[in-house]
């Protein structure tokens, strides 16, 4: 990764390590954008949703807010460029949750072993079908994942994994995304970990309404900042909160 400079929200020039990395998966490589702000307290790996990629404006925005909170990010493409073209035509790969989960797990292990990770705690952020992969990966990796956030996710697609998740999990949905609200409420009942369902007033599935994505980003940053701290993870109390 390369050392670069940028101004933080206070206008101060700070050092950031960033770059495009190639993560080996089976006989191919997946591309990811890895950014580590100064004195990062953890790393969040993004699993993008249906028809999306690491260039997603929404996930890029969420990632920038995490950087301001001192959290590194890995925006991962779970499909190769060739697969993305095929998926754009038939939409099948984006719903292959088992494949996406296996690739995400491989990416987590690769990041863990990378010298730049510095043994930082790892969280997962998933959107749409990527949220199902994040939840499934968290259930399989167990204590190696310190927190999960789902944005407009489809946790129902990882139904058999829900009760095995141990990482604190935040489900964020838009109030006007009726079907996804219902699916997330049902999924929340099957989670046995510390969990929270946050419903953003007036928001639809893509959180395009004024202030909606900012609220999502703030919630995600707060969740990861709290739960990626090792001392917090050791004293979690299992409970459920629903917020509107």
Predicted regions and their residues:
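Alpha/beta-hydrolase fold nucleophile elbow
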Residues: 116-128
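Active-site loop->helix "elbow" adjoining a glycine-rich segment at hydrolase catalytic centers
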Residues: 128-131, 153, 176
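A conserved short beta-strand
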Residues: 143-155
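Short beta-strand/loop motif that positions the catalytic acidic residue
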Residues: 165, 171-173
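Catalytic histidine neighborhood in serine/cysteine hydrolases
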Residues: 191-206
